[in-house]
Amino acid sequence: MARQTTVSAACDLGGPPLLWDKLDRMRDCASRWHHNAVTYAYPAGNDRPERRPLDVVAHRGASDDAPEHTLAAYRKAIEDGADALECDVRLTADGHLVCVHDRRVNRTSNGRGAVSTLELADLAALDFGSWKAPTGEHEAPDRDPERDNREHTSVLTLERLLELVADSGRRVELAIETKHPTRWAGQVEERLLALLGRFGLADPPRDDPSPVRVMSFSARSLHRVRAAAPALPTVYLMQFLSLRYRDGRLPAGVDIAGPSIRIVRNHPEYVARLHRAGNRVHVWTVNEPEDVELCARLGVDAVITNRPKAVLTQLGRR
């Protein structure tokens, strides 16, 4: 436990806190999450304000402007006004949840190897951002270049992302995707729910919309989540439209569909089918203006995009 706390702190921008300071900070973050969720909650009954026809979710952060899954990308998405942040989580060899999409780190870092075979300290030594040059709008006289560089290049733990959202001062939702298959099987969901529990997010009140939802292409993963945390919303992601769910039904206990934009383009009537079955619809990855327009016209509930600022501007919300 002592090693886990020390390693986790090594990836923290604020330096290594003592164990009791870390626990106090987590309790404080849980309080701020609750404050933001309640103060800026949607109206009762999951009804969304009429002024917002669909939610804009930042895919791996504002990943068109900053390296994906870095603190810089998520900070930019919050500054741009994204309603929610999307992240992928994987389990390291020493049991930490990190925000990395690929099974291996080769594409997004200067290292090699599978995330599941590397410890957090190994990942903390890698550069996860220099492959993507930051845009000019991040350069401001009052910014700390050293901090900015760390935020653009350091591996991001889910714990640190939860802290960032807690500090946002407004309601920012989080869509967390579990990556499968994995050598850790159900341990990913177990560790995820334990971490959410420490932030007071694993058991949201049934009469309030949860600020966190869990997504996966794996129905088995979602079943594990629903069994352990039945009040937590789950999203069934779909790359292709299978015959099994063509009528609008979803796996048991799931009430949010996550079809790809390709499915929506090829089968626009599917959105209405999902809605008739009582499901919400979150579409990924929606970057092009014509796709944003299509989703708005069809009445989807959320679009997941690499370009939250551009989408919000197109929707007249900036």
Model-derived regions, located:
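Phosphate-group recognition and catalysis centered on beta-loop-alpha active-site segments
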Residues: A2-V7, C11-L13, L18-R318
